[in-house]
From Swiss-Prot:
It is found in: Nucleus. This is Integrator complex subunit 12. Signal peptide: none annotated. The gene is ints12. It comes from the Eukaryota. It comes from Danio rerio (Zebrafish).
Length: 479
């Protein structure tokens, strides 16, 4: 049986197996030679190639195990032989019979003819293997090599930073040297740079030179660094109300002392309290100082109200009738303040027609505007300041002297000695009135005489406070 099996097997296949299992170094070359001879058989080679392609997938695993056992040099060459051997071993008996016929044909062929044809296919095989390699080189590297050949020197110079950025050349002449920018480290020819570089910049021993692009960027950065200190200006503007707030709070906290320089309007709650106290104690505190609850403009109205009653007293004492008190109040500015003065005058009519009674009535009417409601005193203050000038101008307003009409009232005079007629009337009233009334009048006159000095001191204090506040606000803004 062994003899029959040996006859059925192809001798080329046996040779291939022998070369495959041999450990000699030439086994790979001999396997290549056998492969070339088998491929050079014409139609038989085509048939064998078809069988190889059909069964390559089936025998892929045994091929890998055999190739791993061999050396790396023989593995690439023996893979094709293993495909042929595996295909032949797996074919049917018909393929074996055909292989026997092929061996007979090979024997009939002359040895010279058998040697010559394999040489031709070897060349063809080499061409076939070299052709795809040639295509690969043409597809990928050949265009790259052409580009590199053209721009290799320029690119190398540019990468190394040895060439001009504009013209991409390294040529240097006496008037056209390469200058390096200290910021971006690019090289420029003196002529290539748009603002041409002068020889002074080239020969500068400090070697500090900046290109046009870098100079622009540096200018922009300098402007940006200068702008941030300018931007906080609105921040200072926003801090101004913050600075004002504590000043306002201080002004609101200061109404408690009697003399303050702030012109803030007082609160309604304080107004009601002062009005109630004024109505309750209308006949008392004739020559008292400024009330503690009044601040700002109310303090000025208090001072003017102290001046007003003294003049009305002089006029009423001259007429000698209690009915003249409404007329005296009529000499004052017409408005709500006049009505406020009329009510206490009417209340004093039942006291009698004597000069002493009129003096008492005037005392009552004089004390009411001291504690009058602040809105009324505000209006009165504005009118009296515009009409008489109060303590600032110290001007006197004189009216027509008639026994039935309103006599002259000296506003802002020296404490009761106004015009000549009013002064005479005051003297006659002092002689005709009782000693108690004279004492009251004297006290009021003395109080009225002190009023302008207190107003002047208030004005001076207010001016000083305003100046101090302005200076403090300016210092805070400067900080």
């Amino acid at each position: 049986m062994a003899g029959t099996v040996s006859l059925e097997l192809d001798p080329i296949f046996l040779k291939g197996l022998g070369y495959l299992h041999s450990k000699s170094k030439d086994s790979a070359e001999k396997l290549k030679a056998l492969l070339d001879e088998s491929l050079a058989r014409g139609s038989d080679s085509i048939y064998r190639n078809s069988i190889k392609e059909a069964e390559v997938s089936k025998v892929s695993l045994p091929k890998m195990t055999k190739q791993d056992s061999k050396s790396s040099s023989s593995s690439s060459a023996s893979s094709s032989i293993t495909t042929t051997s595996s295909s032949k071993s797996s074919t049917s008996e018909k393929s074996k019979k055909e292989s026997e016929k092929r061996t007979l044909e090979k024997i009939r062929v002359d040895p010279g003819e058998g040697v010559e044809p394999p040489k031709k296919p070897r060349l063809e095989k080499q061409d076939s293997h070299s052709s795809p390699i040639a295509f690969q080189t043409k597809d990928i590297p050949i265009p790259d090599f052409t580009d590199i050949d053209e721009t290799n020197a320029d690119d190398f110079a540019m990468e190394m930073g040895l060439a001009c950025v504009v013209c991409r050349q390294m040529t240097v002449t006496s008037g056209n040297q390469l200058v390096e920018c200290q910021e971006c480290h690019n090289l420029y020819h003196q002529e290539c740079h748009k603002p041409q570089v002068t020889d002074k910049d080239v020969n500068d021993p400090r070697l500090v030179w900046y290109c046009a692009r870098c100079t622009r960027q540096m200018k922009r950065m300098a402007q940006k660094t200068q702008k941030p200190p300018q931007k906080p200006a609105p921040a200072l503007a926003t801090t101004v109300p913050l600075l004002k707030d504590p000043l306002v709070k201080k002004a609101e906290l200061k109404p408690k002392p009697e003399t303050t320089g702030s012109f803030q309007a007082f609160k309604r709650t304080e107004v009601k309290a002062t009005a109630a106290s004024g109505n309750s104690s209308s006949s008392s505190s004739s020559s008292s100082s400024l009330p503690p609850g009044l601040t700002g403009w109310a303090a000025f109205t208090k001072a003017t109200s102290n001046v007003g009653p003294s003049s009305t007293k002089l006029s009423t004492s001259q007429s000698g009738n209690s009915k003249t008190s409404p007329a005296a109040s009529g000499s004052k500015p017409v408005g709500l303040s006049a009505l406020a003065n009329v009510k206490p005058a009417l209340a004093t009519k039942p006291s009698g027609g004597s000069s002493a009674g009129s003096g008492n009535g005037n005392n009552g009417s004089g004390t009411v505007p001291l504690k009058a409601p602040p809105p009324l005193t505000l209006g009165k203050q504005v009118l009296s300041r515009s009409a008489s000038g109060d303590s600032l101008g110290k001007m006197t307003v004189t009216g027509s002297l008639s026994p039935g009409a309103a006599p002259s009232s000296s506003l802002g005079g020296n404490g009761g000695s106004g015009g000549n007629g009013a002064g005479n009337g005051g003297n006659s009233a002092g002689s005709s009135s009782s000693s108690g009334n004279n004492n009251n009048n004297g006290a009021k006159a003395s109080a009225d005489g002190k009023a302008p000095t207190s107003q002047e001191s208030q004005l001076n204090a207010m001016k000083r406070l305003q100046m101090v506040k302005k200076k403090a606000a300016q210092k805070k803004l400067k900080k």
